[in-house]
Amino acid sequence: MYWRSDEWQEEIYPACEQLSLPEGLLISQNTSFGSQFISRSIFQQKCYKHSVPMLNTNNGLMLNKFAGLLPIAEQTWHDFTGNSSKGSFAYSVVPVLYSISISAVITWFLNIFVITNYTIKPSILLRASTTLSSIYLLITVIMAIIELHKQQKQGFLHGTKLFDCINSSLALNIIDLIVVFLLQINQVQIIMRIFSRQKDKRLTFFVGIFASITSQVLWAITRFHSFSDDSEAGDILPAFQYLVRIAMGVCYAALVSVFVLMKINYIIANKKIWLITLLTVILIYGPVAFFIADVSNAWVFELSEIFSVVTYDICVVIPWEWCNKYNSIMKAKEKEGVLGRKFYEDELYELDRFELFVDEEDEDHENNNNENDDESGNENDNERGNNDHNNRHGLSRNGENTHKGYRPVNFDGNDKGFGSIFETYRRTKETFLNITDHVIAKGLAIPRSASVFTGTPVSAHNDEVFRMDNLNHKRDDPADMTLENQEDHRNTNRNNTIRFASNSDIHRTNNSTAQNRRDVFVYSTREVIIDASDTET
């Protein structure tokens, strides 16, 4: 970042410069190198980037009993640890190693929790992202141990050198790029779960994917591209990328918080989700708090990528489990109620696209009226049919008014070119929405309502008709009826008709939507009246 550089800009400490030593006895820990008496020598202590002293681990018997540190080296170490922020305890090896280990343990625990969740199977994306984050932290721990082992063999330990080893690893940077992108998509997945309308889910999907790709592309440019010292892009892009991540974290936390506040009455009524709701509200602000700490604290910046993965992992797994708990409570509530779940106007129009609300008797009247040359009879029948249709399909017409774009448009013979263009546009749009719904339903495991459909409508003229004779408690034997009663009985059966989509149409519907979802639509063409005696009513 342009406001904070990870490079050491401090002056060279005196102990890190070349020191002229007087005559004396030179003793080496190497057994092949014998002790020698020298009259003059030049000594240079091992320092980080030849400017900052490091912790000496050669505390043997010779150093403790017979010889001590050089006075200038001892004074330099005292100044470095007492007056420099880089020499504080936070930058030593122990806090760094503990921070990495704790982050790895948290990530592994969340991964095990997701994989072993037997109540509601998590999505493939969630399992993949948590598994990759665990692998990322595992590789980080292994690299840290190897680097500390190398430093120990050289006789020095330094936390900042460990920072450089982790941050400069190409393999870790590539894995971090993939893991953070998947975790950001998981956040989009959780936001989609709190919306009920399919249109809102699609909009969230497109906006979230675009924001995630933009954020990670900017991060990749700032991480893998080397900017010159006088390049303005090297100062602007890191700051802008950081602002994008902060904005995404704030939007995610705000949307989840608003949804929790809207459903606070249901949450208060169910004590089982109090704890996980509190954890969700607190932990979703983890990335925001981390970004603030990252800007204000240079030590957090050194481990920013590791902490970023952990905070993303936490604010994804916990809200996902909260959504599972909340959805199970709402499903139980809907089962206890009479009305079930809510239907929206776009869903009502989706149902009407199948022409399942069209009455067969009205269709017969319409066909007969077209063939009849009597204008007065046609006007009366059409007026009666239109009144019946308006009474039964008021709701579906409201959906039609709000979704006129789905209705087929008829063009004249001179406008065949426009008709083909419009038909191509319609089919392309349906295919695109169908693919999007498949990705949402399968890849992101977002359940959708059974009435949402993006394929070609099924024609009502190809439907099979079944008589629901068993709906009436009292059925007279047709053999015992007169001709007039039998005719009334047939008319009653015609009115009590349930229409099902044919097997081929259901198969096409299943292929165009989700394979694991049963798309069975049952609607009555007329109001079904169950015969009952006066005493029973």
Swiss-Prot record:
Region (Disordered): 362-410, 472-495
InterPro entries (UniProt xref): PalH
Extracellular membrane side: 1-94, 149-164, 225-247, 294-297
Chain intervals with Acidic residues compositional bias: 362-380
Cytoplasmic membrane side: 116-127, 186-203, 269-272, 319-537
Gene Ontology biological process terms in this record: cellular response to pH
Location within or outside the cell: Cell membrane
Membrane topology: Multi-pass membrane protein
Keyword Transmembrane: yes
Biased composition (Basic and acidic residues): 381-391
Cellular compartments per GO CC: plasma membrane
Transmembrane segments: 95-115, 128-148, 165-185, 204-224, 248-268, 273-293, 298-318
Keywords: Cell membrane, Membrane, Transmembrane, Transmembrane helix
The family this protein is said to belong to: Belongs to the palH/RIM21 family.
Protein purpose: Required for the proteolytic cleavage of the transcription factor RIM101 in response to alkaline ambient pH.
This protein's name: pH-response regulator protein palH/RIM21
Species this chain originates from: Debaryomyces hansenii (strain ATCC 36239 / CBS 767 / BCRC 21394 / JCM 1990 / NBRC 0083 / IGC 2968)
Source organism phylogeny: Eukaryota, Fungi, Dikarya, Ascomycota, Saccharomycotina
